[in-house]
């Protein structure tokens, strides 16, 4: 089996690329970073530091690399069995034209074997969004063939991969946590379902997408925002602060009550899942900076994201949300000289006040009780 993976960054090498290579799949990375491409093609291997209770160093070998903006990547698409991505949500649109060219070439060469494409991004239904970009880039005469022969498979991914500690070290070395989860929608594949250790197949993807969003992402963000306010540097430092931990755990329990009501998750198993995530936040080997985790607060306060979406669920089912509201208030206080969204958020609050600003960002009714609760919490943490 041959696979092409877009994105040779830390997540690509440390998570999805590693799983594919470990499964014995012939893997080629596509990226724009020439330093990384040259290193991969010189060595055809790299090391992954897996950190946790049992630290180990794994070697990933037998890999190649091509530029994601050249003809080589188009040629590869015509012949591979699987395409995956870990490029970041905003970059999906940029790689779509190359994928479209490769699919057109595949059709022209009469390669009718099924091809499956899986976007492994921190977003909901990312592959469906990628499909839209690819379809827009295709000629009308190629679209029906693509619908017939190419599966666009949505997925949910979960593994903490912090940025490299130093810019001067080996460009291929990467550190990841022990935990990883890659859940894919088995109803969207073309051809036989793949057997890749570490890939979990489901016919109820949205339950797992929201479980991750409402638990890991919600908890991670609130830990970062409360941690920044309290002067902590890392997620570990913040979650070891008992006052922060109580709010984070409470928020995950509130969002968990929504998941249990909506999808029928087992309450005891979900409580264990929350405990596992708190343990991941405590990992002393992951130097996860609160400022990095907190960046892009406007996106994280939007209606479909990790803070407002679970809150809307509590309103839908008439469930408590006091800790989620505290997390939202902390997010409104997030300031960072390195993050344009943090600066935009601050300017919006200065211009319109917290009530109107939150309503504009989140889509919540400015006159609702829950916005009043958030504004009270915001003012209480000044």
From Swiss-Prot:
GO terms for cellular component: cytosol. InterPro entries: 6-PGluconate_DH-like_C_sf, 6PGD_dom2, Mannitol_1_phos_5_DH, Mannitol_DH, Mannitol_DH_C, Mannitol_DH_CS, Mannitol_DH_N, NAD(P)-bd_dom_sf. Keywords: NAD, Oxidoreductase. PROSITE patterns: MANNITOL_DHGENASE. Disulfide bonds: none annotated. It comes from the Bacteria. NAD(+) binds at residues 3-14. It is an enzyme of class 1 (oxidoreductase). It catalyses: D-mannitol 1-phosphate + NAD(+) = beta-D-fructose 6-phosphate + NADH + H(+). GO terms for molecular function: mannitol-1-phosphate 5-dehydrogenase activity. PANTHER family: ALTRONATE OXIDOREDUCTASE-RELATED (PTHR30524:SF0), MANNITOL-1-PHOSPHATE 5-DEHYDROGENASE (PTHR30524). This is Mannitol-1-phosphate 5-dehydrogenase.
């Amino acid at each position: 089996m041959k696979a092409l993976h877009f994105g040779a960054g830390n997540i690509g090498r440390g998570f999805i690329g590693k799983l594919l290579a470990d499964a014995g799949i012939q893997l080629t990375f596509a990226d724009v970073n020439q330093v990384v491409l040259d290193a991969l093609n010189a060595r055809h291997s790299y090391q992954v530091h897996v950190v946790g209770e049992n630290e180990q160093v794994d070697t990933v070998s037998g890999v190649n690399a091509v530029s994601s903006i050249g003809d080589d990547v188009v040629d590869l698409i015509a012949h591979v069995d699987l395409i995956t991505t870990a490029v970041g949500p905003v970059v999906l649109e940029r790689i779509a034209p190359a994928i479209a060219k490769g699919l057109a070439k595949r059709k022209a060469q009469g390669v009718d074997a099924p091809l499956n494409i899986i976007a492994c991004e921190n977003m909901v239904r990312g592959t469906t969004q990628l499909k839209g970009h690819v379809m827009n880039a295709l000629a009308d005469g190629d679209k029906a063939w693509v619908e017939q022969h190419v599966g666009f498979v949505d997925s949910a991914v979960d593994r903490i991969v912090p940025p490299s500690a130093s810019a001067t070290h080996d460009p291929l070395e990467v550190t990841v946590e022990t935990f990883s989860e890659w859940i894919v929608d088995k109803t969207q594949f073309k051809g036989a379902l793949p057997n890749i250790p570490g890939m979990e197949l489901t016919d109820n993807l949205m339950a797992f997408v929201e479980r991750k969003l409402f638990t890991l992402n919600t908890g991670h963000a609130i830990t970062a925002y409360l941690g920044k306010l309290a002067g902590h540097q890392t997620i570990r430092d913040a979650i070891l602060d008992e006052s922060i931990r109580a709010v984070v755990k409470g928020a995950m329990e509130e969002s968990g009550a929504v998941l249990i009501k909506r999808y029928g998750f087992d309450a005891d198993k979900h409580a264990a899942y929350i405990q596992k995530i708190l343990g991941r936040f405590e990992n002393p080997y992951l130097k996860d900076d609160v400022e990095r985790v907190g960046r892009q607060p406007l996106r994280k306060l939007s209606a479909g994201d990790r803070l407002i979406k679970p809150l809307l669920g509590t309103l839908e089912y008439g469930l408590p949300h006091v800790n989620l509201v505290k997390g939202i208030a902390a997010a409104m206080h997030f300031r960072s000289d390195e993050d344009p969204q943090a600066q935009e958020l601050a300017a919006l609050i200065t211009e319109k006040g917290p009530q109107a600003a939150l309503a504009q960002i989140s889509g919540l009714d400015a006159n609702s009780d829950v916005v009043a609760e958030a504004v009270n919490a915001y003012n209480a943490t000044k």
